[in-house]
């Protein structure tokens, strides 16, 4: 039997449902497990963690929106991840991890051989967490390093922390998707990120929606896109104080670069973005940016789900 998906959202889990989930994990019949916003007792959470520890078919685990709600649950998840070898995408968006909680998880994350996509958006992280995350980016032996990283809505991270992340992305990472939306970055941090993008050989998607940018940083990003060949294909700048004209210019340049790649036969296969990642703001919908001068043209910038697309590549 081919592995299937279990997706439950915002519901209290009964004992019978937990037993079915654990049975599916133990039988290696589950490829995707999503329990976003579900309510369950500590005992049942522990049962699921013990089952996923030995699961060999599980590739995506979504525990967004407060499922990992206490230090004891963080420890149980860390213990499961130390044993598990199959999970490629881990979503913990909206979990009250804090720096201390990520420190508990980090050893398991750092040693996991398959993990390529990590969502730590809205997890109450600060600079100490950034220090740990930077260590997850570069390849290490058989590990490929993270290819998708989401850090949306973590306002406790300071410019010092963001500068450290920018250096890590530029220097040794394999990151293809970087979601930093709804953080108070400002123009100074955006300038450092522009340098990181110009240096990176892999970064394709950068989400800076609602990050306090102005025309100053937009001009820097425009210069970067115009003058330096990069892998960047999608740049999200919505909900910033940036003129429509500058947004249009950046949009046009990114579109031109993609067209040139396609004409040369070097464009990568279209990735299937948007599955698994939570909106950074509770009221927020899809992250898309329409080029201002053409209401019919749209550059779709849903910037998640890389783990799924990588799974598809593996299965082909």
Curated annotation (Swiss-Prot):
SMART domains in the record: LRR_RI
Organism: Rattus norvegicus (Rat)
Gene transcribed to yield this protein: Lrrc73
Superkingdom, taxonomy of origin: Eukaryota
UniProt keyword terms in alphabetical order: Leucine-rich repeat, Repeat
Key word Ribonucleoprotein present: no
Keyword Disulfide bond applies: no
Leader sequence segment: none
Protein name: Leucine-rich repeat-containing protein 73
Disordered: annotated span: 257-296
LRR repeats: 57-78, 86-106, 114-137, 145-166, 174-187, 202-223, 231-250
Disulfide bonds: none
TM region(s), chain numbering: none
InterPro entries: LRR-containing_regulator, LRR_dom_sf
Comp. bias (Basic and acidic residues): 272-281
